[in-house]
UniProtKB/Swiss-Prot annotation:
Family stated for the protein in its record: Belongs to the heat-stable enterotoxin family.
Keyword Metal-binding set for record: no
Protein name (record): Heat-stable enterotoxin STO
Organism per entry: Vibrio cholerae
Principal location: secreted
Amino acid sequence: MKNLFIALMLLFSSIALSQTVENDTKTVQQPQQIESKVNIKKLSENEECPFIKQVDENGNLIDCCEICCNPACFGCLN
């Protein structure tokens, strides 16, 4: 009975340890995602954008500086 109790304690402690490691991994990944959102926000606030005004597929004028300074943004071409 004593051996069974010890075996169960070891099993549950290893499960708890693996969950703790998994939770720590999730915590580490979150700041990277937040940082990328902040960078996009900074890019969208940049007033010295090299992009000229473009027209979307509906003929609406797009000021690319209002969207972002990333050339991958929709409608923004150099």
